[in-house]
């Protein structure tokens, strides 16, 4: 696939849709809800927030050059999903999503289907209004407006991103940070839900939200504040289908390995022993009672 243009090739959507159609045909009876692509906007999110360098710099990196050489293509022709950030890349990703939705429905599957986005709570400080609006359009709105016909939009949000006239700002000195280096800001979820629904017109499913920390008391505090934001949305009539915490178990967090601990259940990687945390008991109580104190 990468040798044929990857996620900038017009041939990719049909191949992806064929795959999704087969999954739905053979396993659809086991699926309660489907997300075709996880975080369709992730590449733009990482570059916009300064977490990942620009594509110009990435294509000059030794690993990128080696990968393209092994594939027999140029660095400019290497287009993995994570780096489909150009307008052509965005168009191909969204075409793949829409064709996948059609293929899933054509398979006879009846479960609701959508896509998930890393919806950024982009806020501006004095002087940053214009650039914040530009990033909001590039990262969020360009995708949220292209979900017509879906059953829902999956929202994944962990923190806010502040912008001044120069671009993304680091967290303020002395502010509480998570193990991911994010600002502790659970209120971001409410803002993300509001923007996702207002822009897409779709019901919202919170498909990821959580806290990487060694202090489980802070996890409970974070989730409680985030859920209060969800309740605010529900009270105003915004259709929020549900809330999914990330994650049940301490997970493998890509290049960060097992260092960040998001889980409601701890995992000892030496023995694989699982230990239920207080946050799991607390969240289970919220779910059973369907109330927040």
Language model: regions and residue ranges:
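Non-catalytic scaffold segments within catalytic domains of secreted glycoside hydrolases
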Residues: 1-293
């Amino acid at each position: 696939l990468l040798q044929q243009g990857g996620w900038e090739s017009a041939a990719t959507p049909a191949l992806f849709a064929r795959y999704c159609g087969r999954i739905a045909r053979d396993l659809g009876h086991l699926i309660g809800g489907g997300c075709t692509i996880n975080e369709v906007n992730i590449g733009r999110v990482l570059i916009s927030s300064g977490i990942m360098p620009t594509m110009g710099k990435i294509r000059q990196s030794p690993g990128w050059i080696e990968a393209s050489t092994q594939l027999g293509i140029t660095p400019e022709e290497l287009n993995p999903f994570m780096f489909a950030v150009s307008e052509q890349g965005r168009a191909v990703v969204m075409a793949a999503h829409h064709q996948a939705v059609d293929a899933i429905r054509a398979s006879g599957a009846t479960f609701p289907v959508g896509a998930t986005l890393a919806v950024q709570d982009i806020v501006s400080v004095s002087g940053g209004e214009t650039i914040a609006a530009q990033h909001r359009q590039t990262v969020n709105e360009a995708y949220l407006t292209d979900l017509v016909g879906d059953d829902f939009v999956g929202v994944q949000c962990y923190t806010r991103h502040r912008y001044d006239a120069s671009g993304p700002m680091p967290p303020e000195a002395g502010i509480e940070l998570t193990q991911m280096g994010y600002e502790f800001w659970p209120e971001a979820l409410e803002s993300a839900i509001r923007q996702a629904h207002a822009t897409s017109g779709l019901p919202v499913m919170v498909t990821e939200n959580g806290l990487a920390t060694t202090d489980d008391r802070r996890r409970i505090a974070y989730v409680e504040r985030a859920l209060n934001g969800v309740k605010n949305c529900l009270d105003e009539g915004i259709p929020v289908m549900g809330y999914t915490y990330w994650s049940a178990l301490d997970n493998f967090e890509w290049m960060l390995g097992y260092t960040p601990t998001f889980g409601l259940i701890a995992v000892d990687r030496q023995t694989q022993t699982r230990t239920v945390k207080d946050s799991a008991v607390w969240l289970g109580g919220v779910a059973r009672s369907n109330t927040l104190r």
